[in-house]
Amino acid sequence: MKTLLLTLVVVTIVFLDLGYTMTCCNQQSSQPKTTTTCAESSCYKKTWRDHRGTITERGCGCPNVKPGVQINCCKTDECNN
């Protein structure tokens, strides 16, 4: 009986994902797609232009940006690709 109860608890934790974390893309500019697991509840994509052309930065959270930098924050997994 104890084994059955323990099995039910483990299955519940796995399926409910009690420690849910966000997955955000974190590749820079035109690099191949990579992701990271984040503790924050949002992802961002920052874009700006400099002497190299258009630069794109992706990551976790929703940072403040300087004037001239575009930012898009979102709240679903890999939404910042």
Curated annotation (Swiss-Prot):
Q: Where is the signal peptide?
A: 1-21
Highest rank taxon of the organism: Eukaryota
Does this entry carry the keyword Cell wall biogenesis/degradation?
no
Give a brief account of the tissues where this protein occurs: Expressed by the venom gland.
Q: Which InterPro entries match?
A: Snake_3FTx (IPR003571), Snake_toxin-like_sf (IPR045860), Snake_toxin_con_site (IPR018354), Toxin_cobra-type (IPR054131)
Could you tell me the keywords of this UniProt record?
Acetylcholine receptor inhibiting toxin, Disulfide bond, Ion channel impairing toxin, Neurotoxin, Postsynaptic neurotoxin, Secreted, Signal, Toxin
Instruction: Report a single Gene Ontology molecular function.
Output: toxin activity
Where is it located? Secreted
User: Would you tell me the Gene Ontology cellular component terms?
Assistant: extracellular region
Record-annotated disulphide pairs: 24-43, 38-60, 62-73, 74-79
State the family it belongs to: Belongs to the three-finger toxin family. Short-chain subfamily. Type I alpha-neurotoxin sub-subfamily.
Q: What does this protein do?
A: Binds to muscle nicotinic acetylcholine receptor (nAChR) and inhibit acetylcholine from binding to the receptor, thereby impairing neuromuscular transmission.
Q: What is this protein called?
A: Short neurotoxin 1
Q: What is the organism lineage in this UniProt record?
A: Eukaryota, Metazoa, Chordata, Craniata, Vertebrata
